[in-house]
Regions:
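Alpha/beta-hydrolase fold catalytic core
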Residues: 1-26, 47-50, 90-91, 275, ...
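Active-site loop/oxyanion-hole signature of alpha/beta-hydrolase fold enzymes
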Residues: 12, 54-96
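Conserved HGGG/HGGXW glycine-rich cap/lid loop of the alpha/beta-hydrolase fold
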Residues: 18-64
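Gly/Ala-rich beta-loop-alpha elbow adjacent to hydrolase catalytic centers
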Residues: 97-101, 105
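Flexible "cap/lid" loop of the alpha/beta hydrolase fold
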Residues: 117-156
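Conserved alpha/beta-hydrolase catalytic His-Asp/Glu region
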Residues: 152-208
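Conserved serine/cysteine hydrolase catalytic core
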Residues: 188-246
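Catalytic histidine-centered segment of alpha/beta-hydrolase-like enzymes
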Residues: 258-267, 271
Length: 290
């Protein structure tokens, strides 16, 4: 059991929560429109030999929004992670990512393998890609979504319970899990509550890699990697696994009960897999499911 209270911290534009005081660091990266509370359920089970850092990605949770003239491109999250590690003077770390956070994690590990001690991907692998024939449509949709946002006003909800119930329904998670995510993503408003999330997060991306580009960017990941899939998870993730498993030299697959947020639904089961992977005998680690 963890002996440490969770600390709220900020460095530069990045807010994060941390617990533990070990020599090695574990970085946790959440999914799209989630926040660092995504990993708080792990805290009671975490090994105290590590320093655990759950990061709020830009535009999420308590981290700063991008500047008014910027947009949220996937590749920028990878660079943001590098910037955070540099600011925090973390030379090497274990990385755990969920959903979009998993995709950020595997691309970072591909680009900066010497900084990554181990990799755990939860309900996410590879990079979301598009057909080259969809390039123009992708661009037009991105421009249209920007125009639409200019004409809209941020929605105000009567209370946090209303927003929690809505998130529970949309994400198919319990009210308790939804409340944990919503609490960190909202702020008071004179007429109720409002999301802290940057509305630009919902913009269509103006650019996506083709599948061949995505595979090229990820090919040859040498970091020992654990992929955790949910038994009732997204079918898209299973397809992504089939597409991208060849990019990893050492990839092991485990399945646990639950839906897309299985790590929050079954935190002890999930964390035990993570801990075993981080403490693995490197010489015994082999590729599975190739």
């Amino acid at each position: 059991m963890s002996l440490y209270a969770i600390k709220e911290q900020k460095i530069g534009p990045f807010s994060y929560q941390s617990w533990g005081e070990g020599k090695q660091t574990v970085i946790y990266l959440h999914g799209w429109q989630d926040n660092s509370n995504s990993f708080v359920p792990f805290a009671p089970f975490c090994n105290t030999q590590y320093t655990h850092i759950a990061l709020d990605l830009a535009g999420h949770g308590h981290s700063d929004w991008k500047s008014a003239d910027a947009f949220y491109y996937f590749i920028d999250y990878v660079y943001d992670l590098k910037c955070f590690l540099d600011l925090a003077q973390i030379k090497t770390c274990h990385i755990v990512g969920h959903s979009m956070g998993a995709m950020i994690a595997n691309l970072f590990a591909s680009c900066y393998p010497t900084r990554c001690l181990s990799l755990v991907l939860i309900e996410g692998i590879g990079i979301v890609s598009s057909s080259e024939s969809d390039t123009k449509t992708q661009l037009i949709n991105a421009f249209n979504s920007r125009d639409k946002l200019k004409q809209s006003e941020p929605r105000v909800y009567p209370d946090i319970n209303t927003l929690t119930q809505l998130r529970s329904k949309i994400s198919d998670v319990s009210v308790e899990i939804a409340a944990l995510l919503v609490t960190r993503n909202t702020q008071p408003h004179p007429d109720g509550v409002q999301l802290r999330l940057d509305p630009r997060l919902k913009h269509h991306s103006g650019f996506r890699y083709s599948i061949s580009q995505a595979k090229s960017a990820l090919n040859g990941i040498s970091i020992p990697t654990l992929l955790v899939l949910a038994e009732q998870g997204y079918d898209m993730i299973v397809r992504q696994y089939s597409q991208f498993k060849g990019c990893f030299d050492s990839l092991r697959l485990e399945k646990i009960p639950g839906g897309h947020h299985c790590h929050m639904e079954n935190p002890e089961i999930c964390y035990k897999l993570i801990e075993a992977h981080q403490n693995r005998d490197k010489t015994a680690f082999t590729t599975e499911g190739a």
